Amino acid sequence: MANTTSAKKATRKIARRTAVNKARRSRVRTFVRQVEEAIASGDQAAAAAALKAAQPELMRAATKGVVHANTASRKVSRLAQRVKALSA
């Protein structure tokens, strides 16, 4: 348990940041899931639209430090590859 005033404040700040990060991570997962569902349904137009919405969300999460930049880039790349394969 935190004893000093500064440690107590740090604990409160961590709790707030954790809540924000959890919400951002959940939002990213939702967008990625929408892309994967569109890919699974075979709808190329819907998959492309979902990817277009998911990409900035993933990169924003990377900018904010919620996910690593390389992780976000890898996810975008792999999703784009799968969407492109639908049109082939």
Swiss-Prot record:
Keyword list, A-Z: Ribonucleoprotein, Ribosomal protein, RNA-binding, rRNA-binding
GO molecular function: small ribosomal subunit rRNA binding; structural constituent of ribosome
GO BP: any one term: translation
Domain of life: Bacteria
Region (Disordered): 1-21
InterPro entries, per the entry: Ribosomal_bS20 (IPR002583), Ribosomal_bS20_sf (IPR036510)
UniProt entry tagged with the keyword Chloroplast: no
Protein family: Belongs to the bacterial ribosomal protein bS20 family.
Summary of the function given for this chain in its UniProt record: Binds directly to 16S ribosomal RNA.
Protein name per Swiss-Prot or TrEMBL: Small ribosomal subunit protein bS20
Organism of provenance: Sinorhizobium fredii (strain NBRC 101917 / NGR234)
